[in-house]
Regions:
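Feature representing long, continuous alpha-helical segments
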Residues: 60, 90, 109-110, 151
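A short structural micro-motif
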Residues: 53, 132-135
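Glycine-rich phosphate/dinucleotide-binding loop and adjoining beta-alpha-beta core of small-molecule
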Residues: 1-94, 162, 166-168
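Phosphate-handling active-site elements
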Residues: 116-129, 137-143
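Short glycine/threonine-rich catalytic loop with a Thr-x-Gly-x-Asp
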Residues: 96-112, 122-123, 142
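Short, well-ordered loop/turn and helix-capping segments at boundaries between secondary-structure elements
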Residues: 8, 106, 117-118, 155, ...
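Charged C-terminal helix
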Residues: 134-168
């Protein structure tokens, strides 16, 4: 199982739901750096006891999931929340509604995996991925499908690179 290899693992969607009935075993199996990416429905299946923690406070809920699982958690939504193992948390508020379509989460996961492969640490990779995901979706506008988002990302990255703050 990938979770026992000692290698960084990125899990999302069905890779999480498969553990719905054995969540506690799943948490115990995570022995290496792990990133979990989910929306509320997937989150509720993997962390059923955290649904209404503290009146539904998203930060409390996601911090609880990170502590319980030992994974960096990204909970997708209108305000995407990322929580690190040390409790640091950020909310990304630039998630336009056109991101709520099939395949878009796969693009986010792949973007984050790419950042991780380049040496970015999980918390920063999650937040950078979520932010760029939102910017690219906003740039494209309505009618977005996964392929459109992939095609929009290079121009967003070029735009950032051309800014003085990102120059060498």
């Amino acid at each position: 199982m990938a979770l026992r290899t000692g290698k960084l693992v990125v899990l999302e969607a069905d890779a999480l739901i498969v553990f719905e009935d054995i969540a506690s075993l799943f948490y115990e199996t995570i022995t290496a750096p792990c990133v979990m990416i989910s929306h509320d429905g997937e989150f509720a299946k993997v962390f059923p006891d955290l649904g209404d923690v503290d009146g539904g406070d998203t930060f409390v809920k996601v911090r609880g999931a990170a502590k319980l699982s030992g994974a960096v958690i990204l909970l997708k939504g209108a305000d995407t929340v990322v929580v690190a193992l040390d409790g640091r948390a950020v909310a990304n508020e630039n998630a336009p509604t056109n991101l709520a379509t099939g395949g878009i989460g796969d693009v986010l996961s792949e973007l984050i995996a790419g950042f991780l492969a380049q040496g970015m640490v999980p918390f920063e990779a999650d937040f950078a991925g979520a932010w760029l995901h939102g910017v690219a979706a906003s740039e494209f506008g309505s009618g977005l499908v996964a392929g459109d988002l992939i095609n929009a990302l290079p121009s967003v990255l070029r735009s950032l690179k051309s800014r003085k703050a990102f120059s060498k």
